[in-house]
Amino acid sequence: VYKRQLLEQQLNSKWTVSANGEWMSSDGHYPYTLHYGDAKEDLTSREKRKNTDVQTFRAEAGLYGIFSDKEQYRLKAYYFQSSRGLPKATTLYNDHSLQQLWDKNTFVQSQYKKEFSRQWVFQSSAKWNWSYQRYLDPDTPNSKGKTENSYYQQEYYLSASVLYRMLDNLSFSLSTDGSINTMNANLNEFAQPTRYSWLTAFAGKYMNDWLTISASALATIINEDVKEGGSAGNHRKLTPYISASFKPFYHEEFRIRFFYKDIFRLPSFNDLYYQEVGNTKLRPENARQYNVGLTYSKNVCPFLPYLSATIDAYYNKVTDKIIAYPTKNLAVWSMRNLGEVEIKGIDATGSLSLQPWERIRINLSGNYTYQQALDITNSDPTTEAGRTYKHQIAYTPRVSGSGQAGIETPWINFSYSFLFSGKRYVQNENIAENSMEGYSDHSISISRSFHILKTHTSVSVEVLNIANKNYEIVKNFPMPGRSVRATLNIRY
C-alpha cells in the first residue's frame, strides 16, 4: 500500500486547500487448506486461491473557507476506481474462475454553515454522485459465451437545516433533504428506475447538568418510477425517535440512557435491479428499536488518566427484514425479505489509558456483543417457513467481540488487535450441516513518525492474521493467512 498526502496548504487567512491520494495493488494469491469432506479424518490438500487480484486508486481534494467564527464553507471532490478478480467458492476439483468486477465512483459535495446569532444557525449542503460498475463472467454457457453487465447510477442531493436555540438549554431544529436517484444499464428491457426522495425532520433537545432529552419525527416521502417492469413503489412514512440520558451524581460521569427509534429502510437500487442480485419484489424493512444502557468515565489519577465503560441492552422487532445470501461469488448475492425477526442483545465496551512515565502511554480497549436474532415469521412446524421458527438468522453469531492494546513512546508505537466471532449458520435452519465454526483474527503493528526536510513522514509495518488461519466469514470463501503490509505516508 502506498499513500501520499500531496498537499495541505493555507492559501490565506480564510482559505485552505488539501489533496491526497492512495493506490494499492495485490495479486491476492494466498494459500489455503481445501477439505475433502466435513469430518476431521477426511483428506485435505494445500491449494492457492486464484483470481483474487485487487487494484484500487483513490484521490480527493478539499477546499475549506473560514470567513469568521460564525461562517464556514467546505468543498470536497472525490474519485475512486478499482478492479478485482472474483474467486469462486472453494469446491472440489474446480477452482477455475475468470470473473472480474470494475468499479468507479466520483462525487462533489459542498457545505455551508452560518451562525446568524446565538439563537439562529443555518446550514446547507449539496452533492452530485456518479458511480459505474462492470461485471464480467467470460465462462457463462449462453449464446454470447459470457455475461457482461454495466450499471450507471447518479444522485443529485440538496439539504437545508435551521437550528433555533430558544433558551440556553432548549433548542429546536428543522431540516429537509431532497434527492433524485437514477440507474441505467446495458441490458435489454432494463427497468431504468428514477427515485425521488424527500425527507423532513423536526427535532428538539433539552439539557441541563443532570438530564438530556432529545426527540424527533422524520417524514419520508418516496416516489419511484421505472420504464420497464415492476418498481419498489411509492411510500409515505412518519418515524419517531426519543432518547433520554440521566446523570444521578453531580461529581461522577455516570449516566443512565435510553432511546426508542422507529426505522424505515427502503431497498437500494442494487437490492432491487441488479440482474444477478436484484429482487423487485423486495418490501421495505421496518424496525422498532428499544435500548437502555449505562455509561461511566473517569480521570482516576495521573497513572490512570482515562477509564470508561458502557453497557447497553436492546430489543428490536423487525418486519420484512432485508437479508442477503452469497451465491457463486462475493459480488453476487441473493436478496429477499424475512417476514419477522426478533433481536435481543447486549453490547459492552471498555477502555483505559495508563501513563507509567511522562512520555509513555498504554491504551487498552475492547468490546463484546451477545445477540439473539431469531426468525419468528411462522410457528407452524408443518410448513417450510415453520422449520426455522425461533432459529438464529443466517450469518449472525450469538457472540462476537474485539480488543486493542497499544503502547505509545517517543521512539516507536506498538499495537495489537484481535477480533472473534462465534458459531454461525449459513441458512436460517439451525441444523448441523448448516453450522460454521467461529473464528478469531490477531494482528500486530509497529509505526514511527518523523520529520524529513519539510515533510511529516510516518512508516508502519503490520503483520495480519499472525495465527495464519484461513478462517471463513462466508462459507467456502477462505480468508488469507498471515501477511505483511508496509505503509509509507508522506505529508507536505
Describe the function of each predicted region.
Residues 20-22, 26, 119-137, 249, ...:
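Membrane-embedded beta-barrel scaffold of Gram-negative outer-membrane proteins
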Residues 83, 223-228, 232-238, 246-291, ...:
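Surface-exposed extracellular loop regions of Gram-negative outer-membrane beta-barrel proteins
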Residues 3-42, 60-64, 311:
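Predominantly transmembrane beta-strands of Gram-negative outer membrane beta-barrel pores used
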Residues 13-14, 69-72, 115-121, 165-171, ...:
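Short loop/turn motifs that connect adjacent beta-strands in outer-membrane beta-barrel proteins
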Residues 23-27, 79-83, 128-132, 178-184, ...:
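Transmembrane beta-strands of outer-membrane beta-barrel pores
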Residues 168, 210, 308-317, 334-428, ...:
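Gram-negative outer-membrane beta-barrel transporters
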Residues 26-32, 314, 319-320, 362, ...:
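C-terminal beta-signal and adjacent terminal beta-strands/loops
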Residues 26-30, 37-39, 46-56, 64-122, ...:
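Flexible loop and strand-edge segments within Gram-negative outer membrane beta-barrel domains
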